[in-house]
């Protein structure tokens, strides 16, 4: 158990979530001013003592200013370290650059590893994050990384829907790609439901029998039965939302009566909200790992569930030296 006082600070990425976490822990957010100089450099002023405290900085590195939010985090950590904070934990619900975690083409950087190096160099002692795009990213760090899963939140939500709306209607959990099968299966196992997988394969087609030109088309293959059932798509990131739209269209075509989607991180780039509004999805559920209240006003299908209780409990256990494994069960 830590004898050091727990203090929460935040940058400009998600003040609302920080305050909700503080409320769950029966404390208040610390006093820090994060702004910019006239030449756009990041300025951080910590207006209270952090000497010997167990400091938690809540800062998702998300849109609309991924790089600014990352820089704010690093500068805050440096300031706190120089002010003799006992331990610094970065609470990064959405970990920016997580999708750049491998060398997928010649001369490509592994930017996620670079970000991990920067965070360690700044002086971060521990990272708390949620549903990393790839769990192997934890290995990029030489410090503890607590990757909290949203499975319990999603399972609880589906069980509530089952009692209030689904009633006796069968439902099936769907992974929109091969890469997300493990995530979807974990939820289907807890709900004792069926699992379906959407596989999108490129198939080469010739323009004509006499032509030497060919092109690739995307072929959607559904593994599993959704006929007459409610399909529930499980994914970690909703970015352009084209995948969700194509998946919902394919599921309806295969006989699903309704399509729901539960996604951890709502990135929503470009016209993603318009794409969701135009899709066959009945309801899209996301967490508040990224601020999305403005998008909720534009999309009646969008529902946001809070992760404040999960993150606050993780922080409490880290502070007291308790196991965090059971939180995701």
From Swiss-Prot:
Assigned GO CC terms: cytoplasm; ribose phosphate diphosphokinase complex
Residue ranges, annotated region (Binding of phosphoribosylpyrophosphate): 227-242
Transmembrane segments: none
Pathway: Metabolic intermediate biosynthesis; 5-phospho-alpha-D-ribose 1-diphosphate biosynthesis; 5-phospho-alpha-D-ribose 1-diphosphate from D-ribose 5-phosphate (route I): step 1/1
BP GO annotations: 5-phosphoribose 1-diphosphate biosynthetic process; purine nucleotide biosynthetic process
Binding site for Mg(2+): 131, 133, 146
Compartments reported by the entry: Cytoplasm
The name this protein goes by in its record: Ribose-phosphate pyrophosphokinase B
Top-level taxonomy: Eukaryota, Amoebozoa, Evosea, Eumycetozoa, Dictyostelia
